Amino acid sequence: MPKGCLVITVSGLAGSGTTTLCRNLAKHYGFKHIYAGLIFRQMAKEMGMTLEEFQKYVELHPEIDREIDRRQIEAAKECNVVIEGRLAGWMVKNADLKIWLDAPIMERAKRVAKREGISVEEAFVKIAEREKQNRKRYLNLYGIDIEDKSIYDLIINTAHWGPDGVFAIVKAAIDHLSPSGDAGEDEKEKEVG
């Protein structure tokens, strides 16, 4: 692992494996895990709302999104953190490594169904509706299109690998991360020098 202070963001849609990866990274490297989804869920619970009800409430109260995002940006000032959130890669502009996890919606629906003890069909509908609402909200609030993956350093389709395989890919990326952030420049210096 590169020496110094690392800030890694992990983003992805529901059921893509972001929490599993972040927990594995935190355990292996001793990173602090900042989880925007947990903050969101806790706020829903505090207000006595289901996740779906809170999702609709947040659409009318953008200050909630801004508070979650502020906490992510603040956390990025720490060393050796992994920040998990759909917009983490967008919010933490100076992250050393920005990761997007993806999987086909049916695969993600199966995972969510298993996790939440609901049918795959119900999970599919919930995910599709939530993603539609989130995309609209992020566009309106920040001008961010969640489907734009151009800011990410590493994009992994988690349908192809289990949690251990995804972790191995990300571990390799972290362990070989260029300290300057531009591996091409390091290579040029080696060639010239």
UniProtKB/Swiss-Prot annotation:
Keywords: ATP-binding, Cytoplasm, Kinase, Nucleotide-binding, Transferase
GO biological process: pyrimidine nucleotide metabolic process
EC number: 2.7.4.25
InterPro entries: Cyt_kin_arch, Cytidylate_kinase_dom, P-loop_NTPase
Catalyzed reactions per annotation: CMP + ATP = CDP + ADP; dCMP + ATP = dCDP + ADP
Family stated for the protein in its record: Belongs to the cytidylate kinase family. Type 2 subfamily.
HAMAP family linked to this entry: Cytidyl_kinase_type2 (MF_00239)
Name of the molecule in the record: Cytidylate kinase
Gene expressing this chain: cmk
